């Protein structure tokens, strides 16, 4: 603020008006005070809290008691007197009216007026504005229309002032003009004032940092560290409400000579303050962080922008690339770390600190950088390391004992990455030796690819597969004593995917994969034996030849279930090739059926050779069984296809040959179709399942034998008993109620016995058709050979059926 502000605040008793009254008075009398004070009326308290105002006859404002008590704004410490003050007031009011649009005085327009104001200010020894409880101005907000400088009593002592911030109790706020004392008598009243341009107070810690920073700037100016070595043209430092708060646009510049003397005086007190600060450094709270922003600008040739925010220092060089030393950052870090003092001597050596060099191209779009010095000190575990220079630190500059770890001893990176977060930064990659080792690689289960928990039964597996394999093997051994088969069935083709998610879908494929991985239940016992060998005392060691050698039993092979095998070897559907566009005749239909029967016999032979245990029979026995049961197999398969596809209403010989009711009425077709429909009706009545059908078809293959017996009769009996048990398993799999299993078994075996009578009638028709050449029915070569060998045996009665029930 300019120094003439004190004059403007004197003797307002005859010109100050409030509210709407000021407008009329100012316009009638020509006094500009009314119009000037009108913008401040919006900040006044309610009219009830102020004395009632009246308009004096001379155009001034007053109260009813003005004759008794004098003016409202009369200072209790004394009146400003003299004609020079009144003339100066009139001149200033006219000048304020001329510059009312900008709200402040331009002191550069009239240098003589500035010198006159300074001389008047020096002659003034009392405060201009009353701050007592009874003063109205003490409770009014002062707008920018009343820029003022508070003149105070007493001598100035910067050391006393800094001592207050350093933790001492003593001198109150003071200005930097050489006068000290209490700024006001009642600080609570001033706190209620809403100053438009007032800035918040800063903490003790911030004051020390900014004073040290000012010392650094003075050092650059006096020592020639900057490019031109000139003084700062504009310096704006916030020192709280008790300091000299300058305006924002820099119009309140001081006289050059007075400014130079003021800087020299301030520099001397700064040196005293640093010594005083080192003595009381332990009393400064290190956790206080500044919440204000300090902006420091220089001229256009060498201008810096210094921005201080909590935990961040950002300095930008606009044109050239000279260095700027941040002493305030060092002082703040010194108190944060509790390290040794930071030297700030003014000599040939540069002040140790952090140097930031920035160009306009490199500072555009960059985020605020965080110095690594805010990290806490680490123990000096690497004192033998080579002491390296800090980033941006010129060669030859020795760093003092500032209590901060050097760049070589700090595990934090010296370079500042704008993309990294400010908190929790992990820069361990800067020092490869201190990087954290990567976590241990997890082992994978060889069965389901889950995370393995260890080596179980000789294979690295997870706990789930370990328990599954143990239960599967123990259950398989328990069932081996009864039927010798495992009950795990694969609904697919024994190639299910076993992983962490789908390992429980198919136990059969999971158990197979466990065996393929090499899991062995005896591996646990063998491991215990090996441990016993290692820990056995040497004195009781036996000769190696006498040591029992553990015998690893042969791993059990994965035996597929019988039903799964029967499903796999089931013959494919064969097409007849019948031309349905031509008219149907008995001869053409029977010829097509014989040709289809010949293809089905060939597939039946392949099917029989694929049956488990059938190849164990003698070759003659295999041929005898096929010759005696070929029509059983084809008629039973026809009944299943008709039951499955047509629900027993029609005969489905092939997908392209279905005998409906009309075709059944053809000559020589009715008798055959009636016998075949009986089989279809039995499937419908019993609701035979597919598993039951597969087992019953194998039993039909083994249901007709020669009377003299087979050459491998014992093997035949064993195979037949095996498939009878498989039929029982298929019944148990279907029926939920155990009491109905035997009843179901009885019904199915009765169906097998009834097949003997139904097929016997079909054989008679087949033999008649084959012998009677007048029908002109063609037979395939293989089927003709089978019928030729079978006819004598049936006439002689050399074959007999194997029945489950006696007639």
UniProtKB/Swiss-Prot annotation:
Among the GO molecular function terms of this UniProt record, one is: steroid hormone binding
**Where does it live in the cell?**
Cytoplasm; Nucleus; Mitochondrion; Cytoplasm, Cytoskeleton, Spindle
ZnF bounds (NR C4-type): 445-465, 490-514
Modulating as annotated region, ranges? 1-444
Please list the residue ranges that the record marks as compositionally biased, kind Low complexity.
Answer: 412-421
Give one Pfam hit by family name. Answer: GCR
Chain segments carrying region Disordered: 1-47, 246-284, 412-438
A GO BP term, please?
cellular response to steroid hormone stimulus
Using the UniProt annotation, give all residue ranges assigned to the region (Hinge): 520-553
Q: Does the keyword Transcription regulation apply?
A: yes
UniProt keywords (A-Z) are: Chromatin regulator, Cytoplasm, Cytoskeleton, DNA-binding, Lipid-binding, Metal-binding, Mitochondrion, Nucleus, Receptor, Steroid-binding, Transcription, Transcription regulation, Zinc, Zinc-finger
Report the principal subcellular site: cytoplasm
Extract the DNA-binding region annotation as residue ranges: 445-519
In what residue span(s) does the NR LBD domain sit?
A: 554-788
Quoted from the entry, the domain comment is: Composed of three domains: a modulating N-terminal domain, a DNA-binding domain and a C-terminal ligand-binding domain. The ligand-binding domain is required for correct chromosome segregation during mitosis although ligand binding is not required.
**Function recorded in the entry:** Receptor for glucocorticoids (GC). Has a dual mode of action: as a transcription factor that binds to glucocorticoid response elements (GRE), both for nuclear and mitochondrial DNA, and as a modulator of other transcription factors. Affects inflammatory responses, cellular proliferation and differentiation in target tissues. Involved in chromatin remodeling. Plays a role in rapid mRNA degradation by binding to the 5' UTR of target mRNAs and interacting with PNRC2 in a ligand-dependent manner which recruits the RNA helicase UPF1 and the mRNA-decapping enzyme DCP1A, leading to RNA decay.
The record, for PANTHER family, names: KNIRPS-RELATED PROTEIN-RELATED (PTHR48092)
Assembly, in brief, is: Heteromultimeric cytoplasmic complex with HSP90. Upon ligand binding the complex undergoes a conformation change and moves to the nucleus, where it dissociates. Binds to DNA as a homodimer, and as heterodimer with NR3C2. Interaction with numerous other transcription factors modulates transcription activation.
What family, per the record?
Belongs to the nuclear hormone receptor family. NR3 subfamily.
Query: What is the protein name stated in its UniProt record?
Result: Glucocorticoid receptor
Q: Which organism is it from?
A: Paralichthys olivaceus
Query: Which gene name does the record give?
Result: nr3c1
